[in-house]
């Protein structure tokens, strides 16, 4: 004879199944995190290439990878920090391989033209090996964080564009505070007309992948309004053979 179950029993079983499915979806949707995430947090550094090209005397060059970098903020660092001391956790190993599939959003446009692999190797040796993540997960987590932040799209949606305009620091901060519930650290550099311009953004995430305000933010000098410098073709310095195609970013025709 089949056992009878009360409606409350079926209700409890349904709730338990819904909870398990919810947790499974959360795990699948989240970036990889370290096995022991209680004592660390992450810091992601994103550079605006227009400011870099403007301020460096060497100019910018087309990478030798054959893959054009995106017309967007580039990752320049992904650091693991001790949650107690706020010190970077570095130098754990230098023998672990790295993933070279980073050409668009962790691109190196420094001159002379290069394939970017030295910067990826340095990032892995300095910080990745200490992250508690595999080499593959370390780079994929950095790219996942960058994608979740989606800085240029968020800024443009609020009318903040790389058009030589001056934009308030508070307005830039508000874009990300309202979007990801975390305040970025803004690094400025000197640009045209002796104006400060947006150079890098730093974002922090807890060990579980949740964005947070950076616990020990670096202090940088900026003005109340900063310039958002364009990223134009004329800013790029070619150090390749003259027969090579001019620098182009995927899907976007750069203005002259």
Show the residue positions of the predicted features:
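Cleavable N-terminal signal peptides of Sec/SRP-targeted secreted and luminal proteins
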Residues: 15-33
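Short alpha-helical segments and helix-capping/turn motifs at coil-helix boundaries
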Residues: 26-27, 57-59, 183-189
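Generic recognition of well-structured, leucine-rich alpha-helical segments
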Residues: 28-31, 82, 127, 179
